[in-house]
Every structure is written in structure tokens, then in C-alpha cells.
Design a protein with these regions (language model features):
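Conserved active-site and cofactor/substrate-binding residues in soluble primary-metabolism enzymes
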Residues: 82, 86, 144, 184
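Gly/Ser-rich helix-loop-strand patches that form or flank binding pockets
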Residues: 14-15, 21, 27-28, 104, ...
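Structural beta-alpha unit
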Residues: 14, 40-46, 50-52, 65, ...
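Glycine-centered small-residue hotspots that permit tight backbone geometry or close packing
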Residues: 11, 35, 91, 109, ...
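Charge-dense, low-complexity intrinsically disordered segments
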Residues: 9, 71-74, 78-82, 136, ...
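Short secondary-structure transition/capping segments
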Residues: 79-87, 118, 151-156, 204-216
Length: 216
């Protein structure tokens, strides 16, 4: 059902649970996991250039500025790559423990944009990502990066992790409205229910006053 499972990570609690669930899905469906992290070295380079005007006078020489830019760029890029590797090492460890094949991907750019482009380009069967990340704001239900990715991806099933507790018990609920998308969701839910031994419940909502208001 899912040959490739894409898991973006940022070392947050929701991200770590996404990794745990990704491994669980991969064991059931015989999938390969693709772990990714996005870092923004170019953004740091841009911010450094914006701050150059505030540097001491001795650094305003163009040659010295160029030297400082190269040093800054090298340090930032290397530092962000080390952080990225440490995040992906966690995915590597979990996959190795479960004997799951893993592909590591380090991406550069704006988080949501790089993720949406990577998913769209490679067409991963399933994407599992946390609803919130390290930049979570108190009382947030879903983070801006996750929301933007969901709104832009059309070729991958999306599993958004909202609870950092293990997925035990409970049931799968499907909202149906007669569209082919909702019936596709129902078919997916039935397959997942069978795979995870969970009951499936289909629900539909209607507004008894809609037609009266619309046609009178």
C-alpha cells in the first residue's frame, strides 16, 4: 500500500513521534522510509549582509567584508549540516533497530516550500509529519509549516501527528460527503483498519436548514 514513507524531522516531540509511527507503518507495509530535514543557510547569509552596516569601521573595507562573508557562510553551512545530520541520525537509529531501509535527505531553503517541492517532485506514497515543530506557539493546533505543506501537496497521503503519545487503542473515523475524495479516504481507512486491527467508523454531517435557505 505504501512503498515509500516520507518523514520530515526537526527533533521536536511531534517529529519524534512521527518517526516512531513511520517505522511502525513501514514494518506493516514493507516500506522504505525517507527522512528529511530542511536548513536555511541562505537565509542566514542574507541576514548577515543586512547587519553589515552595523559592523565596526575596520570591517567596512570591501575585501574584509568579503572575507567575513565567506567565513560566516562556511561556519553557518557547516553548523546547520551538523544539526541536520544529528536529526537524521535519530531516524537512522530507529530504522536500523527495526531493519527498515532508510534514505536520508538534507534540503536547503524555506522549510514548507522545500518540503512541498520535494514531496511533489518525488511522489512519496505517504507523508508523516508533526502538527507542531520546535517553533510551536502555545495553544497552537497546527504549525504554519505543516499547514502550508498540506495545502500544497496533492500526490501524497498525509498523516499529521497531533498526539505525542503512542497510537494505541481507539478507532479510525472517516468523514464522507459523497465525493470521490471522501470515498478514497474511506478505502484508505478500511485498509489501515485491517492493517492496525482498528474499527472504522464513517460519519457524515448535513445542515437541515441549508436547502430551505438556498432555495426559498
Amino acid at each position: 500500500m505504501y512503498k515509500t514513507i516520507y518523514v520530515p524531522v526537526d527533533n521536536s516531540d511531534h517529529s519524534n513521534m512521527a518517526v516512531e509511527l513511520g517505522v511502525r507503518f513501514a514494518k506493516i507495509f514493507g516500506s522504505k522510509i525517507v527522512g528529511s530535514h530542511v536548513y536555511a543557510a541562505k537565509m542566514h547569509d542574507k541576514r548577515f549582509k543586512q547587519m553589515e552596516a552595523g559592523l565596526p569601521e575596520e570591517y567596512h573595507d570591501e575585501k574584509e567584508l568579503d572575507r567575513q562573508r565567506q567565513i560566516h557562510d562556511s561556519l553557518i553551512t557547516r553548523g546547520l549540516q551538523i544539526i541536520t545530520d544529528s536529526y537524521l541520525d535519530f531516524v537512522d537509529q530507529k530504522c536500523a533497530e527495526a531493519n527498515i531501509p532508510l534514505e536520508r535527505r538534507s534540503l536547503e531553503g524555506r522549510n514548507w516550500k522545500a518540503l512541498a517541492e520535494d514531496i511533489t517532485k518525488n511522489g512519496y506514497d505517504l507523508t508523516i509529519m508533526g502538527a507542531l515543530g520546535v517553533g510551536a506557539v502555545k495553544d497552537s493546533v497546527i504549525g504554519s509549516n505543516t499547514e502550508r505543506v498540506i495545502r500544497r501537496v496533492r500526490n501524497s497521503d498525509m498523516f499529521i501527528v497531533k498526539d505525542t503519545k503512542p497510537m494505541n487503542g481507539g478507532k479510525i473515523v472517516v468523514a464522507v460527503d459523497g465525493s470521490h475524495y471522501s470515498f478514497g479516504g474511506l478505502k484508505t481507512a478500511l485498509a489501515l483498519g485491517k492493517a492496525f486491527n482498528k474499527p472504522v467508523e464513517a460519519i457524515s454531517a448535513f445542515d437541515p436548514y441549508f436547502h430551505y435557505a438556498a432555495f426559498h
